[in-house]
Amino acid sequence: MAHKCASAKLLSGIMALLFNGKSLLRPICLHVHNHLVSNSDTNIVWP
């Protein structure tokens, strides 16, 4: 039971970390993307 509880706590922690990471990285990624797009000499292909 303790192992199941610990794994559930770990899973929720990972999910929270991923969610927070996404919300933190989104504006940074948008800023970098806009910066790269504004430079006409860069030909980086985004997947």
Swiss-Prot record:
Signal sequence annotation: 1-25
GO CC field: fungal-type vacuole
UniProt superkingdom: Eukaryota
Keywords per UniProt: Signal
Protein known as: Uncharacterized protein YMR247W-A
Organism: Saccharomyces cerevisiae (strain ATCC 204508 / S288c) (Baker's yeast)
